[in-house]
Amino acid sequence: LECHNQQSSQTPTTQTCPGETNCYKKQWSDHRGSRTERGCGCPTVKPGIKLKCCTTDRCNK
């Protein structure tokens, strides 16, 4: 599986995720504004954080 792994509005980059079946995209706000994190897997998140998990290559744009 290949997932995007750039933070927020950085130039898109990807990583290969051996053995993983999910990519994720987390979004939240802090004192610097809206934040986005992407990567392999499907992590558990705290309340107030939006999480989208998906199962195809580069699906977490």
From Swiss-Prot:
Main localization is secreted
Q: Which Pfam families match?
A: Toxin_cobra-type
Task: Spell out the subcellular localization from the entry.
Answer: Secreted
Tell me the lineage of the source organism: Eukaryota, Metazoa, Chordata, Craniata, Vertebrata
Protein family (similarity comment): Belongs to the three-finger toxin family. Short-chain subfamily. Type I alpha-neurotoxin sub-subfamily.
Spell out the GO cellular component terms annotated for this protein, sorted alphabetically and separated by semicolons: extracellular region
**GO MF annotation list:** acetylcholine receptor inhibitor activity; ion channel regulator activity; toxin activity
Q: Which InterPro entries match?
A: Snake_3FTx, Snake_toxin-like_sf, Snake_toxin_con_site, Toxin_cobra-type
Q: What tissue expression does the UniProt record report for this protein? A: Expressed by the venom gland.
The protein in question is named Short neurotoxin 2
Q: Which cysteines are joined by disulfide bonds?
A: 3-23, 17-40, 42-53, 54-59
Q: Where is the signal peptide?
A: none
What is the stated purpose of this protein? Binds to muscle nicotinic acetylcholine receptor (nAChR) and inhibit acetylcholine from binding to the receptor, thereby impairing neuromuscular transmission.
Provide the alphabetized UniProt keywords.
Answer: Acetylcholine receptor inhibiting toxin, Disulfide bond, Ion channel impairing toxin, Neurotoxin, Postsynaptic neurotoxin, Secreted, Toxin
